[in-house]
Curated annotation (Swiss-Prot):
Lineage of producing organism: Eukaryota, Metazoa, Chordata, Craniata, Vertebrata
Membrane topology: Multi-pass membrane protein
Entry-linked InterPro entries: Ig-like_dom, Ig-like_dom_sf, Ig-like_fold, Ig_sub, Ig_V-set, IgSF_BTN/MOG, Myelin-oligodendrocyte_glycop
Gene: MOG
Coiled coil: none
Recorded GO MF terms: signaling receptor binding
Organism field: Macaca fascicularis (Crab-eating macaque)
GO cellular component annotations of the record: external side of plasma membrane
Protein name from the UniProt record: Myelin-oligodendrocyte glycoprotein
Length: 247
């Protein structure tokens, strides 16, 4: 009767190592690194800014969970899960201001666009990719600058005062020009008046001159007195009518 052959020790060891290698390779098959820009990204207040992020090695990230949040309280800036943007989980200050650019998501590359940048957006952002239970992330720094950061306070004061000074100078020059022209016209009219003066003017009766001067002055005054008396009588009549019929 032939005896059964037993497996040798080297063959068992090789099988064990091969099985271990398969397990290790399968466990590390889904691992990747998340890479973001090394230098801070700069943006001006009111502009748009784009925060790029990718995984290495590149792979299709359509089925992954991708998002941005802000430390230290993990406020959700934008979240992409199950192939859709989860707008309901955004922090209130970012609702309606973010957009995930997914043109290259098949290569593991995405970009977050933030519209209407505010000073409060300055600081750190964290981009993460999650594939099942495995997650990696990268930090991104955003610097927000004022469009007039190059202007010193003294220049701002000068820019505010300069238009007023220019307006005053312009008005003054216009006034001087008009005054000079009016003086010339007045001088010419006086000279013409002296040339065309009629000595018979003094023979006009004094009552006509008085009437010509007083009527334009007293006319409006008399009309005002008449209107006042009419209004006074009307109000007095209404008051008496109310006294007679109180209800």
């Amino acid at each position: 009767m032939a005896s059964l052959s037993r497996p040798s020790l080297p063959s068992c060891l090789c099988s064990f190592l091969l099985l271990l290698l398969l397990q290790v390779s399968s466990s590390y098959a889904g691992q990747f690194r998340v890479i973001g820009p090394r230098q801070p990204i700069r943006a001006l207040v009111g502009d748009e800014v784009e925060l790029p992020c990718r995984i290495s090695p590149g792979k299709n990230a359509t089925g992954m969970e991708v998002g941005w949040y802000r430390p230290p309280f993990s406020r959700v800036v934008h979240l992409y899960r199950n192939g859709r943007d989860q707008d309901g989980e955004q922090a209130p200050e970012y609702r309606g201001r973010t957009e995930l650019l997914k043109d290259a998501i098949g290569e593991g590359k995405v970009t977050l666009r933030i519209r209407n940048v505010r000073f409060s957006d300055e600081g750190g952002f964290t981009c993460f990719f999650r594939d099942h239970s495995y997650q990696e992330e990268a930090a991104i720094e955003l610097k927000v600058e004022d469009p007039f950061y190059w202007v010193s306070p003294a220049v701002l004061v000068l820019l505010a005062v300069l238009p007023v000074l220019l307006l005053q100078i312009t008005v003054g020059l216009v006034f001087l020009c008009l005054q000079y022209r009016l003086r010339g016209k007045l001088r010419a009219e006086i000279e013409n008046l002296h040339r065309t003066f009629d000595p018979h003017f003094l023979r006009v009766p004094c009552w006509k001159i008085t009437l010509f001067v007083i009527v334009p002055v007293l006319g409006p005054l008399v009309a005002l007195i008449i209107c006042y008396n009419w209004l006074h009588r009307r109000l007095a009549g209404q008051f008496l009518e109310e006294l007679r019929n109180p209800f």
